[in-house]
Structures are given as C-alpha cells and as structure tokens.
C-alpha cells in the first residue's frame, strides 16, 4: 500500500 494513499484516506476521514 502506498503511504500517500493512506495519508489521503486519513486526511479525508479527519475532514469528515
């Protein structure tokens, strides 16, 4: 898994 994807996913969840 690419860290960038993980960071993006976490960022979106935090944005919710």
Curated annotation (Swiss-Prot):
Keywords: Amidation, Amphibian defense peptide, Antibiotic, Antimicrobial, Secreted
Location (main, coarse): secreted
Protein name: Riparin-2.1
Modified residues (Leucine amide): 16
GO biological process, one term: defense response to Gram-positive bacterium
Domain of life, source organism: Eukaryota
Compartments where found: Secreted
Species annotation: Crinia riparia
Assigned GO CC terms: extracellular region
């Amino acid at each position: 898994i690419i860290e960038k994807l993980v960071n993006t996913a976490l960022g979106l969840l935090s944005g919710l």
